[in-house]
């Protein structure tokens, strides 16, 4: 294994995760060529110009599960060309098996990606030995790639254990993991941080960045946000306040973000959100009005109306607080 050009030291600040805009009619099961590349370029330019530090593509709401191979490459080619080496780009390469993930990873790196955003096969859950072997195999096969691990309990049929994190920390190409951060009633973040021994950051959600940083000062250099697709200004204001040590300001932004995102989980229950997360997030992006996300792709096109309304309410609230932070960030 070799060390990639992008290292864990480069994963600081705000890591934006983007959706994959679709054309009208993309919800049809026989739709072809569904990616709106013009909207993709517009979205990426807006987000990069806002000052986001790192970009990830094709996670769950980025619809890595619904894009064809050709669509995935066309989308990421547009992202990479639009970013134009201004910030690191990690392209989503998750598939149902190791060989397809490696093939996809090689193609994405060939487009000019700085690294890969990689989840694990989930048809059957992987035990720790299989999980570590999988990531080691991908890194061995694509030695130029920096890798961000995708730790999503709902999608991958279980959380990555602290023991597995300790083994992953021995793979130099792994530069971060997309995590949730500090959670009430759980010591997983503390255990996982101890396991990786500072070799790469465990990225909390932006709405959990401040609590995670307060619990573990100096150990949380970055956080991730999909809400950048609703307008990055609130999370960029949080980033600035944290970077400048303005803790009262950071608390105020954190509270605004918590209020805006409160309706996302139906009844406050993430287990109800996860089966419909693509659709709910799509409703949020649509209501925020910052980008034109288009419809989600088949078969993830329907959800309970109340769940979609919760997502839309997040988008509306986000659009409201965004106006305040557009003005705040314009101040010297």
Swiss-Prot record:
Q: One short Pfam family name for this protein?
A: DHDPS
**Active-site residues, as the UniProt record annotates them:** 178 (schiff-base intermediate with substrate)
For this protein, the activity regulation entry reads:
Not inhibited by sodium borohydride or sodium pyruvate. Unaffected by EDTA, EGTA, Mn(2+), Mg(2+) and Ca(2+).
Q: Which reaction does it catalyse?
A: (3Z)-4-(2-carboxyphenyl)-2-oxobut-3-enoate + H2O = 2-formylbenzoate + pyruvate
State the superkingdom: Bacteria
Stated pH dependence: Optimum pH is 7.5.
As given in the record, the signal peptide range reads none
GO BP terms: namely:
phenanthrene catabolic process
> What is reported on how temperature governs activity?
Optimum temperature is 45 degrees Celsius.
EC number of this enzyme:
4.1.2.34
* Assigned keywords, A-Z: Aromatic hydrocarbons catabolism, Lyase, Pyruvate
Gene3D superfamilies given in the database record? Aldolase class I
The record's GO molecular-function terms, alphabetically, read: 4-(2-carboxyphenyl)-2-oxobut-3-enoate aldolase activity; 4-hydroxy-tetrahydrodipicolinate synthase activity
Where exactly is the site Involved in proton transfer during cleavage? 150
Induction statement: By phenanthrene.
Q: What does this protein do?
A: Plays a role in phenanthrene catabolism. Catalyzes the transformation of trans-2'-carboxbenzalpyruvate to 2-formylbenzoate and pyruvate.
**So what family is this one in?**
Belongs to the DapA family.
Subunit composition?
A: Homotrimer.
Q: What is this protein called?
A: Trans-2'-carboxybenzalpyruvate hydratase-aldolase
What's the source species for this entry? Nocardioides sp. (strain KP7)
In the UniProt record, the gene name given for this protein reads phdJ
């Amino acid at each position: 294994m070799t060390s990639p050009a992008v290292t864990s030291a480069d994963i600081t600040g705000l890591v934006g995760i983007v959706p994959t805009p679709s054309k009208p009619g993309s919800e049809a099961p026989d739709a072809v060529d569904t990616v709106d590349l013009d909207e993709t370029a517009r979205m990426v330019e807006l987000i990069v110009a806002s000052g986001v530090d790192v970009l990830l593509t094709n996670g769950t709401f980025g619809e890595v599960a619904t894009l064809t191979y050709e669509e995935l490459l066309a989308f990421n080619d547009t992202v990479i060309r639009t970013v134009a080496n201004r910030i690191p780009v990690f392209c989503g390469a998750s598939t149902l098996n190791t060989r397809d993930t490696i093939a996809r990873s090689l193609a994405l790196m060939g487009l000019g990606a700085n690294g890969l955003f990689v989840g694990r096969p989930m048809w059957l859950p992987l035990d720790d030995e299989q999980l570590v072997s999988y990531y080691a195999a991908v890194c061995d096969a694509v030695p130029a790639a920096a890798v961000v691990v995708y730790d999503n309990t709902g999608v991958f049929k279980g959380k990555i254990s602290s023991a597995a994190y300790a083994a992953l920390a021995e793979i130099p190409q792994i530069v971060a993991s997309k995590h949730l951060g500090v959670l009430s009633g759980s010591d997983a973040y503390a255990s996982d941080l101890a396991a990786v021994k500072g070799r790469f950051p465990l990225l909390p959600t932006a709405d959990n960045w401040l609590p995670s940083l307060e619990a573990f000062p100096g150990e949380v250099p970055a956080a991730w946000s999909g809400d950048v697709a609703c307008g990055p200004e609130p999370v960029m204001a949080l980033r600035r306040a944290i970077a400048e040590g303005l803790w009262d300001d950071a608390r105020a932004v954190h509270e605004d973000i918590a209020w805006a995102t409160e309706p996302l989980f139906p009844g406050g229950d993430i287990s109800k959100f996860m089966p419909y997360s693509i659709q709910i997030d799509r409703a949020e992006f649509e209501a925020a009005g910052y980008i034109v996300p288009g419809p989600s792709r088949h078969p993830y096109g329907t959800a309970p109306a109340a769940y979609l309304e919760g997502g839309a309410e997040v988008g509306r609230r986000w659009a409201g607080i965004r106006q305040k932070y557009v003005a705040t960030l314009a101040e010297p």
